[in-house]
Amino acid sequence: MYRSMAILSSLRHAYSQISTRSYLSRSKVGFSSNLSSPLDSFAIVPSRFLWKFRTFSSKPDSMLQLVLENDWSKEVEEGLRKPDMSLTHETAIYVLRKLEKYPEKAYYFLDWVLRDSGLSPSTPLYSIMLRILVQQRSMKRFWMTLREMKQGGFYLDEDTYKTIYGELSKEKSKADAVAVAHFYERMLKENAMSVVAGEVSAVVTKGDWSCEVERELQEMKLVLSDNFVIRVLKELREHPLKALAFFHWVGGGGSSSGYQHSTVTYNAALRVLARPNSVAEFWSVVDEMKTAGYDMDLDTYIKVSRQFQKSRMMAETVKLYEYMMDGPFKPSIQDCSLLLRYLSGSPNPDLDLVFRVSRKYESTGKSLSKAVYDGIHRSLTSVGRFDEAEEITKAMRNAGYEPDNITYSQLVFGLCKAKRLEEARGVLDQMEAQGCFPDIKTWTILIQGHCKNNELDKALACFANMLEKGFDIDSNLLDVLIDGFVIHNKFEGASIFLMEMVKNANVKPWQSTYKLLIDKLLKIKKSEEALDLLQMMKKQNYPAYAEAFDGYLAKFGTLEDAKKFLDVLSSKDSPSFAAYFHVIEAFYREGRLTDAKNLLFICPHHFKTHPKISELFGAAA
C-alpha cells in the first residue's frame, strides 16, 4: 500500500492534470455469460462457426503413434517394418519433427531409419536430429550424431550451425558452443565439396543462364550427388531463379550425368524459391515434385512458411498451409494457432484468409483448441467486427473453453483501436463481474489504447486505478506510458515520471525507453535531465548511451558540459579513452578546435599519445 501511495504521488507530480474520477465504466460491449444451455447458444452461431468432429488417421501418424506410445524395442521395430508402414524420406522428417520433445525416442528412431529401414541418410535428417538433441541438452548423443554425420560424408549446413551455436551459447553450454564452432570451421576447411560448390555458384551468378554457362559447368566434370546439389542451391539462395536454372540443368539431362532429383533436392529447391520474386516458380516446382511422386516435408513447410511470413506474403502462407493440410504430413494445431496469430497481427487482418485457415483445420475432423478460437477472435476484434467476435466467444464456451485474460485483452485492444475507449474501460468491470480479473497485460493494453488515441490524462487515470487494485508497474507498462508522454511532447514530465517510478516502484526501464527519452530531452536542449537519465542507466548496469551526447555537445555544449558528461561516464577512476576521444573528435569535426584541444589538455597523459589522437590532430598534438 505504501508503494502504491508513493507511485500515485509521483504520478500527480509528473502530470498535474490527472482527473481524480475513475474512467472505468460499464459497457454493453463484452461477453455474455448467461447462456441457458450449450445447445441453445450454439443455435445462434452462424454456420461457419459450427465445428464438426470426426476421426482421422494417416500412415505417418500411425508410425508416429507407434513410436510415441511405446518404449523402444524389437517389437516397435517389427511394427515399423509392416507393409502398411512404408517409410519415405518425407515420413522420416515428419516423425522426427513431431518427436522434438522426446530426444531419446527421436534418437532411436533415426538410428533405426539409418541402420535398418533401407532409407538413405541425408543432411536434413541429421540436421533435425542435431537440433532436437541440442534443444533437450542431450550432448553425448549430439556429439555421437555429429561424428557419424561427418564420417558419412554429410555436412553441417550454415542454418543448422547457427541454430545450434545460438542455443549452446546460452547459460552453461558455452564450452560446447566453442567446440561446435571449432568443428564447423574445421569442416569448412576440410570439405572440398564446399569449394567446388562455391566455384559452381560463381559460374552461374556471373551472368544470365546461357549455353556458355552450361559449357563451363560441363567442363568442370562435376560429380553430382544429392549432397552436392543441396550445397550449390544453398550457395545460390540469394539468386533463386538462377538456382532454379541450375536445378533443372542437373536434373534434366543437361549435365549428361544421368543424375535424377530426389525428395531431398526438391525440398532444398523449395526453400530457395520461397521468395517474393520467385513464388510462381516455387509453386511450379511443388507441382513438378508431386508429379515425380515426392511430397514437401514438414521441415521444409515450417521453414518456407516462416520465409513467407517474414516477407509478409500472407496469401501464399495460407495457400501453403492449405496445401500441406491436404497432404499426408499435416502441420500441428500449434502451427495453425501461430498462423492465425500471424494473420491477426496485420494492421487490417484479412478475414477471408483467417477463415480459410480455420476451415481447413476443421476439415481434418480435429477439435479446435482455445488458441485457434482466440486467433479467430483476435482478427475479428482487430477489424471492429465485435458482434461476430461475440459469436466466436459463444462457440468457444460451447466447446468447453471460458474466455480468459487473453480473450478479453483482444476485445479491449479492438475497442481501443476503434476509438471506443469508454467501452474498452467497461470490459474490465465485466471481467471482474464474471470472475476473470484483469492482469497486468490487460491493463497495459487498455492504457496503451488511451495513449495512442491522445488521451494521456485518461491513460494515467487508468494507471492510477490499476495501482489501487494492487498491481505494480512493470518495464513494458512504463515504456507504454513514456510513449504517451512523448506523443504529447511532455518530455520533461516523462523524465520526472520515469525517475520517480525507478525510485518508488523499483522498476527497471528498458534500455530502449532510456534511449528514446534521452534523445527527446536533448532535442529540446535539456542536457541536465538527459545526464540524470544516463547516470541512472549506468546504475542499472546498462551500457551508457553516450553516442547521443557526442553530437549534442559538439553543437550546443560548453566545455563544462563535456566535463560533466565525462564524469557521468567515469568508472572507478576516470572515463575510458573511447569516451574522451569521441567527444574530442565531435568538437574537432564541428570546427571547435580550441575546445577540442582544451579537453585534450585535461585528459590523462597517456591518452594524449594515443595513435588516434595523433591521427586526428597531427604529430603536433
From Swiss-Prot:
Organelle transit peptide residues: 1-67
PPR repeats: 122-156, 157-194, 262-296, 297-331, 332-368, 369-403, 404-438, 439-473, 474-509, 510-544
Compartmental location: Plastid, Chloroplast
GO cellular-component term (any): mitochondrion
Keywords: Chloroplast, Plastid, Repeat, Transit peptide
NCBIfam families: PPR (TIGR00756)
Record-given protein name: Pentatricopeptide repeat-containing protein At3g48250, chloroplastic
Organism: Arabidopsis thaliana
